[in-house]
């Protein structure tokens, strides 16, 4: 293999999955990828499974912590920077690419001190704290959504790296003569409100308008959600997880889900209209901002959880399911917003910076 690249991403799948997509692209171009993470994040499972060397530093978030933790914070951060600096010295990367999470701050500072160029990628419409703080140190800042960062020569709007199979042409059946297909992605984080809301809402639809339902309820939520559908007199296929998301997106005509950065990007990639119910307690309310992007362009409807009851959701479902041409228009708009070259673009930017 060729030169080394260091990727920094940790904590949640929202940071790690797009980073893994870029890791594969680097490997396809002959680079060796190393990963900087923390001991408690999802990267500890996903990165070794991908066959990538994982280097760990000890750092946690500071928001909402007590006074003692805040007093210790400078020493914790200094130690984390020192640990990251040792990794960089050992790996000797030509560039460092950060996707957010607690690891990104100390790792980015260590890279800058070592004279290694730093590139930042922000997945959400609102930049996370670590990425915001790294902007002055970064050679380039990549954003998934337009205008996440202030205008500068460093900024590039790239989109989010997502799984390539979602961009394959999907031959959906025409809605005429069949029931619509409704995909519900409850997930695991904040799943219960959607799992409770959907059976009640669909039960209020006229029988002739009720769609076929495929509902991902999340681990340990599937049985109670299936019971809710049965008690409401609604047929539904309820599963804890969906292993083949590309197939599920290809089946669907409409999606009801949260508005995480990757979900929003995948909806665009799959060309799917959606009803988005942002997680209300997400940091910086970034899910609402993500949803506003698709809704503002006409590819989705934004339904705030606090003000959306079963009757409200039923009314919106009725509105869109009775207008197949509107669903088609929303789907076309979603496809237009997709950025199928996001992974290649981010890697191109990194290598341009690394090699001049």
Swiss-Prot record:
Keyword Aminoacyl-tRNA synthetase: no
Domain of life: Bacteria
Keywords, ordered alphabetically: Cell cycle, Cell division, Cell inner membrane, Cell membrane, Cell shape, Cell wall biogenesis/degradation, Glycosyltransferase, Membrane, Peptidoglycan synthesis, Transferase
Binding site for UDP-N-acetyl-alpha-D-glucosamine: 12-14, 124, 163, 188, 242, 261-266, 287
BP GO terms, sorted: carbohydrate metabolic process; cell division; cell wall organization; lipid glycosylation; peptidoglycan biosynthetic process; regulation of cell shape
UniProt-listed InterPro entries: GlcNAc_MurG (IPR006009), Glyco_trans_28_C (IPR007235), GlycoTrans_28_N (IPR004276)
Annotated catalysed reactions: di-trans,octa-cis-undecaprenyl diphospho-N-acetyl-alpha-D-muramoyl-L-alanyl-D-glutamyl-meso-2,6-diaminopimeloyl-D-alanyl-D-alanine + UDP-N-acetyl-alpha-D-glucosamine = di-trans,octa-cis-undecaprenyl diphospho-[N-acetyl-alpha-D-glucosaminyl-(1->4)]-N-acetyl-alpha-D-muramoyl-L-alanyl-D-glutamyl-meso-2,6-diaminopimeloyl-D-alanyl-D-alanine + UDP + H(+)
Cellular localisation: Cell inner membrane
Cystine crosslinks: none
Major enzyme class: transferase
Transmembrane segments: none
The protein's annotated pathway: Cell wall biogenesis; peptidoglycan biosynthesis
Record carries keyword Cell membrane: yes
Membrane topology of this protein: Peripheral membrane protein
Cellular component, GO annotation: plasma membrane
EC number: 2.4.1.227
GO function term, MF aspect, one: UDP-N-acetyl-D-glucosamine:N-acetylmuramoyl-L-alanyl-D-glutamyl-meso-2,6-diaminopimelyl-D-alanyl-D-alanine-diphosphoundecaprenol 4-beta-N-acetylglucosaminlytransferase activity
PANTHER family assigned to the protein according to its UniProt record, in alphabetical order: GLYCOSYLTRANSFERASE (PTHR21015:SF22), UDP-N-ACETYLGLUCOSAMINE--N-ACETYLMURAMYL-(PENTAPEPTIDE) PYROPHOSPHORYL-UNDECAPRENOL N-ACETYLGLUCOSAMINE TRANSFERASE 1 (PTHR21015)
Function according to Swiss-Prot or TrEMBL: Cell wall formation. Catalyzes the transfer of a GlcNAc subunit on undecaprenyl-pyrophosphoryl-MurNAc-pentapeptide (lipid intermediate I) to form undecaprenyl-pyrophosphoryl-MurNAc-(pentapeptide)GlcNAc (lipid intermediate II).
Family: Belongs to the glycosyltransferase 28 family. MurG subfamily.
Protein name (record): UDP-N-acetylglucosamine--N-acetylmuramyl-(pentapeptide) pyrophosphoryl-undecaprenol N-acetylglucosamine transferase
């Amino acid at each position: 293999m060729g030169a080394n690249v260091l990727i920094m991403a940790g904590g949640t799948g929202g940071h790690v999955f797009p980073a893994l997509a870029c890791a594969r692209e680097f490997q396809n171009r002959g680079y060796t990828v190393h990963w900087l993470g923390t001991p408690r994040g999802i990267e500890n499972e996903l990165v070794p499974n991908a066959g990538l060397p994982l280097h760990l530093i000890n750092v946690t978030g500071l928001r909402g912590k007590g006074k003692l933790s805040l007093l210790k914070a400078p020493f914790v951060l200094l130690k984390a920077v020192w640990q990251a600096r040792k990794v960089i010295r050992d790996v000797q990367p030509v560039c460092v690419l950060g996707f957010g999470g607690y690891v990104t701050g100390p790792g980015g500072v260590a890279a800058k001190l070592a004279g290694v160029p730093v590139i930042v990628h922000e997945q959400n419409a609102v930049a996370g704290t670590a990425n915001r703080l790294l902007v002055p140190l970064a050679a380039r800042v990549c954003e998934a959504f337009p205008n996440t960062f202030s205008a500068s020569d460093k900024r590039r709007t790239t989109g989010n790296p997502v799984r390539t199979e979602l961009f394959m042409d999907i031959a959906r059946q025409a809605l005429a003569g069949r029931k619509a297909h409704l995909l519900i992605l409850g997930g695991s984080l904040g799943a219960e409100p959607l799992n409770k809301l959907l059976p009640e809402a669909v039960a209020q639809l006229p029988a002739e308008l009720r769609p076929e339902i495929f509902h991902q309820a999340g681990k340990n939520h599937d049985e109670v959600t299936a019971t809710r559908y049965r008690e409401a007199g609604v047929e539904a296929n309820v599963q804890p997880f969906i292993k083949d998301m590309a197939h599920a997106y290809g089946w669907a005509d409409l999606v009801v889900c949260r508005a995480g950065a990757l979900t929003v990007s995948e909806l665009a990639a799959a060309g799917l209209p959606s009803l988005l119910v942002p997680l209300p307690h997400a940091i910086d309310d970034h899910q609402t901002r993500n949803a506003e992007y698709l809704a503002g362009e006409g590819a989705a409807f934004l339904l705030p959880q606090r003000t959306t009851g079963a009757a409200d959701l039923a009314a919106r479902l009725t509105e869109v399911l009775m207008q197949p041409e509107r669903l088609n228009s929303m789907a076309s708009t979603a496809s237009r917003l997709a950025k199928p070259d996001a992974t290649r673009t981010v890697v191109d930017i990194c290598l341009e910076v690394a090699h001049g």
